[in-house]
Amino acid sequence: MAVIIPEVFAVGVNKAMTSALRAGRIATDYTELVDDIRYCGNKVHFPVIDRISGASVLSDGGTVTFQRVSMTDNAATIKHVTNGVEILDRENVQVKAALKDAMAKQLGESLAQAVDSDIVSEILTNATYVDTVNSLDDAEVENAFVCFGDQRDAASMAGILINSRLAPHFMNMDGFVSATRTNTTNGNGVVVDGVLGYYSTIPVILSDNGTYKFTAGQNGGEDSSVADMIIVKKGAVGVVWQKEPTIEEARDIDKLGTKIAAQTLYAVKAVDLSGVSVLHVEL
């Protein structure tokens, strides 16, 4: 007898995974722009149109200069993430709807954590705008935006991803919590769905997946630790998803139980490094 209905269970896993994503929220979904991904190890191509050069002032009798539109092919490897649970027959009688929902939630969250870590790794490995500071305050956050020049409209930003160890630093910033500032948001500091608040209307998202590094001291030296703050513009980091997670159920007769596996395919690519700024904060 089936423990779950795979199609229904898949909806629950997908919902939980989408809700649990943190770094995934600052990545732009390119799924509808590419072909369906079907096989792990294959390549998926993120289409990016190259910027044309600046316009020129047309003189009397002059002609228009035409520039050919070109595209840069950003290929990424399709990856396979999976997790599973096993339910013994003697426990199955207790697996009511609420417990099945809990299983779907945990499976979805575990898939999300794996994808989040991969997105952060892609960013940290390829970022070109990187700085290291020994404290984090308003001035350092503003300096992290300098690399965007005059192209830093709040509406163009996907979000600010921070390790949870940096939350107290934001709570001490006037630019984040002061009621006298025009760029702050009421309720900042109250974490809702993983969002600490809004910095100049840009969501500040907490994520500990891949955003912290601890190094033990060598030969009696001091330990060191670094937490990351990552600013990403919309479209700078892309992700492609399989249409929905695949759920499979299999009977394990040796153990008198049932195994349930959840899996999905995805690909991640930093497609525009000019839209990414990374700040390593020494703690």
Which ranges hold each PLM region?
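Short helix/loop capping segments that flank catalytic or ligand/cofactor-binding pockets
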Residues: 54-57, 95, 169-172, 269-271
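Extended, compositionally biased alpha-helical segments that mediate assembly or anchoring
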Residues: 244-283
